[in-house]
């Protein structure tokens, strides 16, 4: 009988590294599906974990103020049917305007104002995963606004 399975699995710089008992090291890369969007994968690649990885230290993971991170939250909310179409449309438009500004380190007071207005318009009531995602989306929009203002 062959014993198999993973001793440990870790995410680092866009890949999943697994220490498999029988084979050794497996390296996987995620692909978009109905359960995971391209935006979520791109946002995960942006996660700041530090250059040295020691999972036992359990450093907090942070994400930059970037439109792809906001879009990842939007995808999660849309998958749960927790984002109204008109809100999603408005958010998409303002993130479309913000993306080249962030990518090219440019500023726009008008786009920053629109981002803050979109953040303020989000209904972040209740608790649970939906409220946590809405709060994270709102906070990300404000941080993007700060970055482009």
PLM features per residue range, with description:
Residues 1-77:
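Feature marking well-ordered beta-strand scaffolds used for ligand recognition
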């Amino acid at each position: 009988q062959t014993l198999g399975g993973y001793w440990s699995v870790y995410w680092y710089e866009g890949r999943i590294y697994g220490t498999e008992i029988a084979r050794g090291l497996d390296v996987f890369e995620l692909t978009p599906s109905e359960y995971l969007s391209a935006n979520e994968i791109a946002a995960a690649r942006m996660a700041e974990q530090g250059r040295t990885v020691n999972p036992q230290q359990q450093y907090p993971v942070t994400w930059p103020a970037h439109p792809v991170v906001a879009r990842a939250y939007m995808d999660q909310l849309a998958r749960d049917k927790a984002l109204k179409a008109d809100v999603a449309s408005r958010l998409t438009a303002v993130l479309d305007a913000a993306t080249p500004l962030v990518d090219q380190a440019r500023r726009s007071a008008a786009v920053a104002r629109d981002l803050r207005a979109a953040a303020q318009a989000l209904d972040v009531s209740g608790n649970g995963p939906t409220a946590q995602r809405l709060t994270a989306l709102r906070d990300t929009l404000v941080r993007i606004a700060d970055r482009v203002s």
